Amino acid sequence: MFQFELKKWIQKLNSTLSLFVSLLARLRTMKINTSSLAEQIYLVGPGSLNITLLTACFISMVFTMQIAKEFLHLDAASALGAVIVIAFTRELSPVLTAVIIAGKIGSSFTAEIATMETTEQIDALYLLNTNPIDYLVFPKVAACCIMLPILSTISLTASIAISIFVSFVMYGIPSSIFLKSAFLALSVSDFFSCLQKSLCFGTIIAFISCQWGLTSSGGAKGVGNSTTSSVVTILLTIFITDFILSYFMFQSTGSSIAQGNNL
């Protein structure tokens, strides 16, 4: 049973890569549905902003509470800003934003396309001489690739602001000390790595959710199974990709805090 599920999962991942190649091949001749693109951008961006901000704020509160008291105990409050800002810029903001979008938007994409596949609406598109990649897949991919970096940037800004507030109100750490250590340790490449990760995660969310919907079968039960499998696969792929990207981006950079202290 496990071998069968693993084989099926690998086949779907291969078909996702094929979908990626097919979309790239059609970019020059593609008929872009601007209204659908605008709708998807709103769904992924403004439609997901509230939950993204709430999650970022509360995660930042908890993370700051746990880190700040330990740093005060070690008499290392001057390094608090550097650690928190680096953690959110390099890892937490892009990953948490991607997880939220995977659960909210990825599941929606899969359920929508799977329902269309089950009710033969995909076949109807072919009869109308409309390629599903143009009409369904591209707007979703473009929306995720455009909005994930923007949402991650907003999430990062909110997380840092909340962290500064909690550090001052609960532990008496001045914002000047927090920001000084943060700016000394943070580099432009760290911010660009956040954007690059967000772009990769947006691509993963869009392609996997669309492909799992296009290959759905088995009626209403199949729609549910495809949606669940889609989200699980997206999350697993995001975590694996995050490790690979982090390894190549940061493994050889050395300590940012030590470099900041030397300035």
From Swiss-Prot:
Main localization of the protein described in the UniProt heading:
plastid
The UniProt entry, under Pfam families, shows:
MlaE
Q: Which domain of life is it from?
A: Eukaryota
Location comes to: Plastid, Chloroplast membrane
Q: Does the keyword Plastid apply?
A: yes
Q: Which UniProt keywords apply?
A: Chloroplast, Membrane, Plastid, Transmembrane, Transmembrane helix, Transport
Question: One GO molecular function term?
Answer: phospholipid transporter activity
Membrane-topology annotation of the record:
Multi-pass membrane protein
Sorted alphabetically, the Gene Ontology cellular component annotations on this record are: ATP-binding cassette (ABC) transporter complex; chloroplast membrane
Annotated membrane-spanning segments are 43-63, 82-102, 136-156, 159-179, 199-219, 230-250
Q: What does this protein do?
A: Could be part of an ABC transporter complex.
Q: Which family does it belong to?
A: Belongs to the MlaE permease family.
User: What name does UniProt use for this protein?
Assistant: Probable ABC transporter permease protein ycf63
UniProt lists the gene as ycf63
